[in-house]
């Protein structure tokens, strides 16, 4: 996470930080440069008391807007993303999101669904980007995600390789 902070948190084009959890304290260890932080509870936090100082007030999912794009973030465990990401994507489409970001699998993933793509029992009504940044702390290939919200579309990418410090 420190590498992500050093690379991106001081960039004037960085709008904020999305933290898809399993470890709410991770961000307290680095300088976030005063950026807004959007975060959701993970399955680990489900085992904490609902009013614990670590998890209190942090939602299970969150919808917000940046640059005209509607972004839905969730950890993903409640939608079974380890088995199939499409259920979470159906929900995001129902919420009229432009971008769905989820964690839980600790594996990088990205998918672009153009208008008309079959999803469940219907077609997607507008383009939807689906993105999992992976995990900076666990997994075979530590990674983090970078999402570039441009007027002409969304670019999803991963930074990975070697040990992330």
Residue locations for each model-derived region?
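Short beta-strand scaffold segments in enzyme catalytic cores
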Residues: 62, 109-111, 143-148
